[in-house]
């Protein structure tokens, strides 16, 4: 189906472009959300007559998104989640979780604005892109941790999972050394008693 785009759509074109899209995409997404018009003679005339108004409305929306983006860009949000010892989350962090975290801090983000290739399933610092407008995108940082203390350590740049494994390795080495010292001393005393 040929449609006239009413705003810039990534991968499709800019305002006023006539593009050919799949029927379902046009009927279920573009037309109901008023992102496009069917490309026929009547709609082309309507679009050309209202082009200046549509461009002004789009510019105003872009400016508002830009102002909101200045406040959001580079901000950090802490999400406390349960996870295993390897740092694997019990569940995942989705676009809805990101939007909820931003909105809890006073932002205005819908989950459809959050761009995630796949859900986040590990602890740590994660960069997430939020598309506020078709031409305005910002990046926020998610600090996903098991506790606030862990989140603070991660914010300082510490790799919490690696340090946890290092602490466990050192404790195991110390326990092994203690066993060797205790075991060697006991064997020597048993040997001297047997000699006597």
Swiss-Prot record:
Cystine connections: none
Composition bias type Polar residues, residue spans: 186-196
Keyword terms: Ribonucleoprotein, Ribosomal protein, RNA-binding, rRNA-binding
GO BP terms, alphabetized: translation
GO molecular function: rRNA binding; structural constituent of ribosome
Keyword Ribonucleoprotein included in the entry's annotation: yes
Residue stretches in coiled coil: none
InterPro entries per the UniProt record, alphabetical: Ribosomal_bL9, Ribosomal_bL9/RNase_H1_N, Ribosomal_bL9_bac/chp, Ribosomal_bL9_C, Ribosomal_bL9_C_sf, Ribosomal_bL9_N, Ribosomal_bL9_N_sf
Region (Disordered): 174-196
SUPFAM superfamilies linked: L9 N-domain-like (SSF55658), Ribosomal protein L9 C-domain (SSF55653)
Assigned GO CC terms: ribonucleoprotein complex; ribosome
Function: Binds to the 23S rRNA.
Protein family (similarity comment): Belongs to the bacterial ribosomal protein bL9 family.
NCBIfam families per UniProt: L9
PANTHER family the UniProt entry points to: 50S RIBOSOMAL PROTEIN L9
Protein name (database record): Large ribosomal subunit protein bL9
Primary gene name: rplI
């Amino acid at each position: 189906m040929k449609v006239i785009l009413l705003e810039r759509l990534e991968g499709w074109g800019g305002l006023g472009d006539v593009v050919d899209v799949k029927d379902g995409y046009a009927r279920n997404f573009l037309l109901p959300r008023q992102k496009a018009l069917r490309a026929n003679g009547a709609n082309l005339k309507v679009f050309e007559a209202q082009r200046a108004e549509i461009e002004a409305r789009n510019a105003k929306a872009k400016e508002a998104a830009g102002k909101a983006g200045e406040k959001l860009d580079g901000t950090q949000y802490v999400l406390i989640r349960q996870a295993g010892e390897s740092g694997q989350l019990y569940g995942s962090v989705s676009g809805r979780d990101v939007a909820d975290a931003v909105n809890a801090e006073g932002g205005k983000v819908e989950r459809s604005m959050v761009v995630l290739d796949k859900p986040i399933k590990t602890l740590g610092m994660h960069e997430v892109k939020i598309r506020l407008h078709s031409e305005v995108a910002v990046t926020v940082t998610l600090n996903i941790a098991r506790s606030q203390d862990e989140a603070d350590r991660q914010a300082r740049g510490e790799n919490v999972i690696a340090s946890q494994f290092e602490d466990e390795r050192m404790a195991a080495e110390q326990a092994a050394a203690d066993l060797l010292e205790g075991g060697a001393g006991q064997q020597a005393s048993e040997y001297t008693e047997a000699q006597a």
